[in-house]
């Protein structure tokens, strides 16, 4: 096959609907963690589409440079199509064939790649698709939604759109409704702007109605009911689920989360340990265990007014060590798990291990391709570490400002603005020409809509540092709006 034909083939490949054309970037995930998770779901989560999981696993194998393993996964996907989707075999094969074509293309087996694009073209022609190599069908949109969801928070809105598109065609399809409900639940959970979001409550109820035997979707409904202060109703679902299952780690982990948030830490730990026996490499489970040990530690410290002694002090030290162990395990198993970094760093600080805390915070600050919410949280926690443990007020101010610049609407906003006002005012009492504090107050008052006060502080800062572009820009904006 000539170069021209290779270029032509590439143009056809780009038309296909499959994982290789859905803009799923490997920089946004920990490949080993996602591969591990998919493997666990294939083994233990019987309610999820095995076809979608094998197709996704093939793509992950390709991203790891394991194209032969990717082909084996696609063979597994084909077997599932024949076993479970024989009534729609050709339509359900389109994503798998697209992945085959791309893998063979990357292996320079161009004739094999062309064979699969030909199969796709024949189906599109047979079903009168307006596109030569693309067929609009809800099953493909659903599979796209699952793939996007697996690649993390940056993809949730696109996943939601994919499931919505599928539901337009089949509004009562059980699988489409599960995918949509879980995606909206994830969006509720990731949208941290103060109030509890409950957009997923309706979709979750519908998904449970359409899938009455699905424990996995029920546990999400229980957690959302807990979010909206209907904990008793949520617990009924949890109890019902636990009566029905024995060792489904993906259900146990969320049931444990329910009990952890209810402050029933021993019950949560019991379920987490049970799940961890089955899936010992789960970063989620390790993180949840760390959160339970941390909560128990906080309870003792509160009861002793932050001065535990004797047995209480020994127990606190033991809980800190346990929390560190599990947060560290979570971070090591998923290098993109931002909250595992901040929780581990904070726990090191709690135990007086400041150099270890500093090291983990610096690793967190170097994380790329994470959401703005995660960046916001990292800067906030590092600022607190600098303020209260390192006693470095200027570094704390810098990171509090960075947190607000990344995301100025969140539950942390009031804490951040209060901390900035307190620290900056204190520093100005000692040095009225402290330009960092002046500009920080200007930024905070501008954020709060106090434009005249903001302008006054920026003017003072600009007099000290007249070439600073940030101060000049802020002043111009303020003067034009006053």
Swiss-Prot record:
RNA recognition is mediated by a convoluted intramolecular fold of the TPR repeats (TPR eddy), which scaffolds unique additional helices that form an RNA binding cleft. Undergoes a conformational change upon RNA-binding: unliganded exists in a more open conformation, facilitating RNA entry. Changing residue 291 to A: No effect RNA-binding. GO terms for biological process: defense response to virus; innate immune response; negative regulation of viral genome replication; positive regulation of canonical NF-kappaB signal transduction. Changing residue 150 to R: Reduces RNA-binding. Changing residue 37 to A/V: No effect on RNA-binding but changes size profile of RNA bound. This is Interferon-induced protein with tetratricopeptide repeats 5. The keyword Nuclease does not apply. It comes from Homo sapiens. Induction: By interferons (IFNs). Changing residue 156 to F/A: No effect on RNA-binding. Reduces PPP-RNA-binding.
